[in-house]
Design a protein with these regions (language model features):
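Surface-facing alpha-helical segments and adjacent helix-coil boundary elements at the starts of domains
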Residues: 2-198, 203-207, 216-218, 223, ...
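Extended accessory and catalytic-adjacent subdomains in large enzymes
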Residues: 122-156, 160-374
């Protein structure tokens, strides 16, 4: 699988006029003495070429990086690497490569939307699966379905263990959420005779996410009102064995904390596609943006349209827990913003009216047809 990805990446780079570079090949290095720095070639001699030096300076390689490697060629897809203060390898890519990767991510959004009914049908089924007696009503399938439902409705990041274990600035996502990050309270969202749990509860996540942003996200799910109760079951099932909130039990009754790779494997298994948890955030950002743009006044002039986009991006960024810049560049399909600013959005939006593709919402159905037709 890894070799196949590399072959595809090499082909993509060549098609874009780049070559697939690596920090294992000869390159330039950076030498820091006091408050000054210089760049050396593979023979240890100073780099003197004005174009090379200009290219390197434009990369804005952080001063704190150590073991800096810089590609000798201007068309390498990977332009520089270094080790940051937390001993992590960081990468700087060619702008064309970054744009290619971004476009590829957005290009699959219509396919993701078309696959969502299949994903939802399967996780709805798995949410009802209780496993055997040893699994305490929390088999792998049910817990994965629970987390994917949360991804689908809250757009919370999946998280990773490296960020969770950062002693200075620990941040969290769904797979790394701790017991302390969830609170429960009674709710009357479901009639008494429809309840399967002892008492109907609502839930709220309170945690610090990426970029040190504090999040408060409610999980009162009108379509699946017992979802918070499933989260409560996960919390209650551990009996102090772990601080991690989510866990599942295998067929022998052994518990295992949920990891991000478990969730991504489940998503790929039920979708039949190479989707990941992040695709739910990209889909969510795109859907929210399209919904808000569709509510703008059609007759707004160019100046007002720019203001509207700024307001919209800020709103979506707040919902996703991003900065507006990251939200616009990484989570909102650029076609909606570009078409709106050009004045063609409402015509294209009207042209894609059609029947609701259940279990997708009307706006989700609209977004898919827009991406496929425009």
């Amino acid at each position: 699988m890894a070799n196949e990805k590399k072959i595809n990446a090499i082909a993509d780079a060549e098609q874009a006029g780049l070559y697939y570079s690596s920090n294992t090949e000869e390159g330039f290095t950076r030498e820091i003495k006091g408050e000054t720095h210089s760049y050396l070639d593979s023979d240890g001699k100073p780099v003197k070429g004005k174009r090379d030096l200009k290219r390197i300076e434009e990369m804005r390689i952080p001063p704190a990086w150590t073991e800096v490697w810089i590609c000798k060629e201007k068309n390498g897809h990977l332009q520089a690497t270094g080790i940051d203060a937390k001993k992590r390898t960081q990468y700087i890519y060619h702008p064309i490569w970054t744009q290619l990767r971004s476009e590829a991510k957005f290009d699959k959004m219509s396919t993701f939307g078309r696959t969502l009914p299949k994903i939802r049908e399967k996780y709805f089924e798995d949410l009802a699966y209780e496993g055997n007696k040893k699994q305490h009503d929390l088999p792998y399938e049910r817990v994965m379905a629970l987390i994917v439902r949360l991804l689908d409705t809250t757009f919370i990041r999946i998280g990773n263990e490296t960020s969770r274990d950062d002693k200075e600035k620990a941040t969290y996502g769904l797979s790394t959420m701790q017991d302390e990050h969830i609170d429960f309270e009674p709710t009357e969202i479901t009639d008494e005779h429809d309840k399967w749990y002892d008492s109907q509860v609502g839930g709220k996540f309170t945690f610090v996410g990426k970029s040190n942003k504090k999040h408060e996200i409610e999980i009162n799910d009108e379509e699946i009102p017992d979802l918070p109760a499933l989260v409560m079951m996960c919390k209650d099932a551990k009996k102090g064995k772990s601080d991690d909130l989510f866990l599942f039990f295998d067929e022998d009754g052994n518990s295992q904390d949920v990891k991000a790779y478990h969730v991504n494997e489940y998503i790929q298994e039920i979708s039949g596609e190479k989707f990941t948890a992040k695709d739910f955030r990209t889909w969510g950002g795109t859907k929210l943006a399209a919904e808000e743009i569709s509510e703008f006044k059609k007759k707004d002039d160019k100046k007002q349209r720019k203001k509207n986009i700024t307001k919209m991006v800020k709103g979506v960024a707040k919902r996703l827990g991003n900065t507006p810049a990251v939200c616009r560049g990484s989570y909102i399909h650029p076609r909606f913003i570009n078409d709106y600013l050009k004045g063609s959005f409402f015509r294209l939006w009207k042209d894609t009216l059609g029947e609701q593709m259940y279990p997708l919402s009307e706006s989700e159905s609209h977004v898919i047809r827009y991406l496929e037709n425009s």
